[in-house]
Amino acid sequence: MPELPEVETVRRGLEKLLLGRTILSLEVKVPKMIKTSYDSFLHDLPGQTIQAMRRRGKYLIFDFGQLIIISHLRMEGKYLLFTDQVPDNKHFHLFFKLDDGSTLVYQDVRKFGTFDLLDRKQEEAYFTRKKLGPEPTKKTFKYVPFERALMHSGKSIKPLLLEQKLVAGLGNIYVDEVLWAAKVHPETPANKLSKAAMKRVHDQTIAILQLGIAKGGSTIRTYRNALGEDGTMQNYLQVYGKTGQPCPRCASMIVKIKLGGRGTHLCPHCQKR
């Protein structure tokens, strides 16, 4: 699943390609992906001009001024821009014909992606219902509320971080990296962490997600940015996908366990419970 760095990289690519472009027509081959009114999606979007490309957590936001599309890529979603003919592909599901003759295509092997067409005034309420936490920046991700939330939760730290309520954007790759960097075992109950460990988790969340953005995201399986380029963050991963390899910090073997149904990578020496 694309995580915050990958979605931010897609946003930046789409911004370069789409800003100022007007939708002339569209085709939707998988109506179930449209989570708001299907008829409104088809009838209200033609004539709309893309004024901004924004992001909230793992959600992309196409901003038309009064209207917005909130797009969630889920497991395998990606956007492709074709300047002339669109090739046949059974995994191409949404087609936006643009005023310069190009076509923006949404591709999704799993068909899990979602689209919500909303009035911009509904955006805040939408994300409030999602209980989405703050963005992982020094300005928005404050330590004191984070510490307070951890102290009041007996959940294991990894599943808790993946809920998106404490901070937006962490997924399976980056949470493993954050907890390795913070020297915290993923199964540790949040309220059993020392305050020093809580602070390390907080600070490493910001540092690693920002590094992921700087490196254009991680190309692990099928991820590409909107320009068709691979990310490079996979070259900087310390623990994710490194089962059986030596820990970069202590040379113990990285192991993989199951936690909450997810493959979880850790160093048993550096990340003791």
UniProtKB/Swiss-Prot annotation:
GO BP annotations listed: base-excision repair
Cofactor: Zn(2+)
Cofactor note: Binds 1 zinc ion per subunit.
Pfam families: Fapy_DNA_glyco, H2TH, zf-FPG_IleRS
EC number: 3.2.2.23, 4.2.99.18
InterPro entries tied to this protein: DNA_glyclase/AP_lyase_DNA-bd, DNA_glyclase_Znf_dom_DNA_BS, Formamido-pyr_DNA_Glyclase, FPG_cat, MutM-like_N-ter, Ribosomal_uS13-like_H2TH, Znf_DNA_glyclase/AP_lyase, Znf_FPG/IleRS
Database matches in CDD domains: EcFpg-like_N
Zinc finger intervals, FPG-type: 238-272
Gene Ontology MF terms: 8-oxo-7,8-dihydroguanine DNA N-glycosylase activity; class I DNA-(apurinic or apyrimidinic site) endonuclease activity; damaged DNA binding; zinc ion binding
Domain of life: Bacteria
Binding positions for DNA per the UniProt entry: H91, R110
Catalytic residue list: P2 (schiff-base intermediate with dna), E3 (proton donor), K58 (proton donor), R262 (proton donor)
Coiled-coil ranges from the UniProt annotation: none
Catalytic activity: Hydrolysis of DNA containing ring-opened 7-methylguanine residues, releasing 2,6-diamino-4-hydroxy-5-(N-methyl)formamidopyrimidine; 2'-deoxyribonucleotide-(2'-deoxyribose 5'-phosphate)-2'-deoxyribonucleotide-DNA = a 3'-end 2'-deoxyribonucleotide-(2,3-dehydro-2,3-deoxyribose 5'-phosphate)-DNA + a 5'-end 5'-phospho-2'-deoxyribonucleoside-DNA + H(+)
Transmembrane segments: none
PROSITE patterns: FPG_CAT, ZF_FPG_1, ZF_FPG_2
Keywords for the protein's UniProt record, in alphabetical order: DNA damage, DNA repair, DNA-binding, Glycosidase, Hydrolase, Lyase, Metal-binding, Multifunctional enzyme, Zinc, Zinc-finger
Function (record text): Involved in base excision repair of DNA damaged by oxidation or by mutagenic agents. Acts as a DNA glycosylase that recognizes and removes damaged bases. Has a preference for oxidized purines, such as 7,8-dihydro-8-oxoguanine (8-oxoG). Has AP (apurinic/apyrimidinic) lyase activity and introduces nicks in the DNA strand. Cleaves the DNA backbone by beta-delta elimination to generate a single-strand break at the site of the removed base with both 3'- and 5'-phosphates.
Quaternary state and interactors: Monomer.
Similarity remark: Belongs to the FPG family.
UniProt protein name: Formamidopyrimidine-DNA glycosylase
Organism listed in the record: Streptococcus thermophilus (strain ATCC BAA-250 / LMG 18311)
Taxon lineage: Bacteria, Bacillati, Bacillota, Bacilli, Lactobacillales
